Amino acid sequence: VRAGHPLLGEVEQLVLLAVLRLGDGAYAVPVRELILREAGVDLSRGTVYVTLERLEGKGYVTSWFSEPLAVRGGKARRYFRLRPSGVDAVRAAKRAVDRLAAGTVLAPAARKA
């Protein structure tokens, strides 16, 4: 593990990438839907919520609450945004995978056979 870049789990990577793609206004339901649609991974809502909270604890995302919403029975919605450290963590994870894949059948140059 490199200093400053602890390894991300697969679910953490997916959730961070989904929040990044959704931009400001990302919340758990669209995060879950994007991961299912784009990655084919069906995470429970609970898994998404717990992962978002863990990522916030690690300093990779920040969250805030909306005003109470009538469509939610007067409850607020919790939104998430990537912090620069979250972007750095995703980049570091991608670099690590790319380095490990280099020289294997997964590498672009190796596919030309």
Language model segments and positions:
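Exposed loop/turn and edge beta-strand positions of beta-sandwich/beta-sheet ligand-binding modules
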Residues: 76
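Short beta-strand/turn micro-motifs at beta-sheet edges
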Residues: 2-6, 67-69
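N-terminal hydrophobic signal/anchor transmembrane helix of membrane proteins
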Residues: 1-3, 92-93
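Basic amphipathic alpha-helical segments that dock to polyanions
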Residues: 48-55
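Amphipathic alpha-helical dimerization/coiled-coil segments
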Residues: 85-113
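N-terminal helix-turn-helix DNA-binding core of bacterial DNA-binding proteins
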Residues: 5-47
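Beta-hairpin "wing" of winged helix-turn-helix
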Residues: 58-73
